């Protein structure tokens, strides 16, 4: 089973913040794939369905960002399940301009507390992550304090840029599900 974790913070006050782009994307996947409603699942809400012939579970941690890794505990005990092949994390990335994304098979958390928590639970940096850019393209918009920046509502023009790349991100995720990490990552260069 493939597990896709969308990182974000619970609560209405965080719904439209930059830090919740992982939730925006996972909600879009749920709708596109016609999965059932979210259900309580430990420290998360989740839903499961088929994408093609592959069983996929979508997971939204209900902890705050720095505790997100706790949702992985049940999968770490599954025979044959490996994070390198069966997990993808959807996350905001301040080093990538808004309107762009990066798909990597492994990497560092880059100061992201959600990824730090994931890696602490996995005891490994080797798992696919799709980093959705949140860095402003308008140089007049300064990042300043990082925590303040990621927890502020994303302006409409930037949200539109994320919406514009969502179909391409979904294509990359569907390729990962069907053909694996290497194929999905290599398709990014085309």
UniProtKB/Swiss-Prot annotation:
Please tell me which top-level EC class this enzyme sits in. hydrolase
Active site (UniProt): 19 (proton acceptor)
Q: Where is this site: Stabilizes the basic form of H active site to accept a proton?
A: 92
Species annotation: Gemmatimonas aurantiaca (strain DSM 14586 / JCM 11422 / NBRC 100505 / T-27)
* One Pfam family this sequence matches: Pept_tRNA_hydro
* UniProt keyword tRNA-binding present: yes
Say yes or no: keyword DNA-binding present. Answer: no
User: Where in or outside the cell?
Assistant: Cytoplasm
InterPro entries the record matches = Pept_tRNA_hydro (IPR001328), Pept_tRNA_hydro_CS (IPR018171), Pept_tRNA_hydro_sf (IPR036416)
Q: Which protein, by its recorded name, is this?
A: Peptidyl-tRNA hydrolase
User: What does this chain do?
Assistant: Hydrolyzes ribosome-free peptidyl-tRNAs (with 1 or more amino acids incorporated), which drop off the ribosome during protein synthesis, or as a result of ribosome stalling.
Q: Which gene encodes it?
A: pth
Q: Which HAMAP family match?
A: Pept_tRNA_hydro_bact
Q: How does it assemble?
A: Monomer.
């Amino acid at each position: 089973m493939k597990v896709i974790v969308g990182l974000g913070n619970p609560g209405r006050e965080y719904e439209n913040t930059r830090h919740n782009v992982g939730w925006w994307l996972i909600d879009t996947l749920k709708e596109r794939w016609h999965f059932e409603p979210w259900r309580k699942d430990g420290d998360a809400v989740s839903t499961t369905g088929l994408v093609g012939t592959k069983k996929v579970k979508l997971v939204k941690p209900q902890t705050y960002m720095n505790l997100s890794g706790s949702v992985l505990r049940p999968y770490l005990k599954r025979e044959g399940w490996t994070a390198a092949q069966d997990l993808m994390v959807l996350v905001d990335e301040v080093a990538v301009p808004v309107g762009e994304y990066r798909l990597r098979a492994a990497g560092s958390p880059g100061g992201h507390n959600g990824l730090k928590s994931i890696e602490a639970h996995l005891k490994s940096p080797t798992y696919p992550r799709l980093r959705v850019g949140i860095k402003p393209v308008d140089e007049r918009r300064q990042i300043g304090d990082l925590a303040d920046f990621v927890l502020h509502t994303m302006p409409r023009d930037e949200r539109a840029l994320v919406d514009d790349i969502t179909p391409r991100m979904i294509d990359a995720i569907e390729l990962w599900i069907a053909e694996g990490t290497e194929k999905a990552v290599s398709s990014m260069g085309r």
